[in-house]
Amino acid sequence: MAIVKCKPTSAGRRHVVKVVNADLHKGKPYAPLLEKNSKNGGRNNNGRITVRHIGGGHKQHYRLVDFKRTKDGIPAKVERLEYDPNRSANIALVLYADGERRYIIAPKGLQAGDVIQSGPDAPIKAGNAMPMRNIPVGSTIHNVELTPGKGAQLARSAGAYAQLVARDGAYVTLRLRSGEMRKVLSEGRATIGEVGNAEHMLRELGKAGAARWRGVRPTVRGVVMNPVDHPHGGGEGRTSGGRHPVSPWGVPTKGYKTRSNKRTDKYIVRRRNK
């Protein structure tokens, strides 16, 4: 994997930094594992914007990624690594010994030709998935299930990982990248290793158009809006907003705690680092 800084042959190329991975498959994705992925422009069923800065972008198919890893005891050979436009991590197409193909999140170090496995008896090796009760304390893991059987929800993006730091009865304690220490059920599954493509964070799109290709619309500052649109709007000439920074709905944006899920507080051993 290489980091390529483009020559400034034009204004649009001047600031571009690319992540080039020669190992990625250059052909089309595996068709049986594709689904239609319709765009909604950030609107809900009433047509109202519920998520800002979304709209346009290139058409994409959704890749059906296996986040459950429930084919126990059947070895799978990695056929190829692929780009996935729906996530920051790359994905791997694996062929199981019984003939079935599935996509999985590609962990760091995984290459075409490697053999992976899932299940309680799988060896401790990058790419293998198993219940967390079978994973040694101190191991680095990703694709962590919060609810056994539901599928992975934690540590799925490029370069992400968690560390299993303790085991206590029916629970294990994880240290997440944010610094949060959290208990999860030990019956839930996780995959050994960390997610690959960690260099994703080093890329620079270089121009607004590259963000538009990805379906990202512009962000407008509140101080340049009208009073009807934002608490910072209005005023004659340039203003500072006249108050501490808030969202368009008046919620403070600088360090204000918004976590309200009291139901899961008992599972958080230590809050994330500030």
From Swiss-Prot:
GO terms for molecular function: RNA binding; rRNA binding; structural constituent of ribosome; transferase activity. It holds the Pfam family Ribosomal_L2_C. The keyword Ubl conjugation does not apply. GO terms for cellular component: cytosolic large ribosomal subunit. SUPFAM superfamilies: Nucleic acid-binding proteins (SSF50249), Translation proteins SH3-like domain (SSF50104). InterPro entries: NA-bd_OB-fold, Rib_uL2_dom2, Ribosomal_uL2, Ribosomal_uL2_bac/org-type, Ribosomal_uL2_C, Ribosomal_uL2_CS, Ribosomal_uL2_dom3, Ribosomal_uL2_RNA-bd_dom. Keywords: Ribonucleoprotein, Ribosomal protein, RNA-binding, rRNA-binding. The keyword Metal-binding does not apply. Residues 223-274 are annotated as: Disordered. GO terms for biological process: cytoplasmic translation. Belongs to the universal ribosomal protein uL2 family. Part of the 50S ribosomal subunit. Forms a bridge to the 30S subunit in the 70S ribosome. One of the primary rRNA binding proteins. Required for association of the 30S and 50S subunits to form the 70S ribosome, for tRNA binding and peptide bond formation. It has been suggested to have peptidyltransferase activity; this is somewhat controversial. Makes several contacts with the 16S rRNA in the 70S ribosome. This is Large ribosomal subunit protein uL2. It comes from Vibrio cholerae serotype O1 (strain ATCC 39315 / El Tor Inaba N16961).
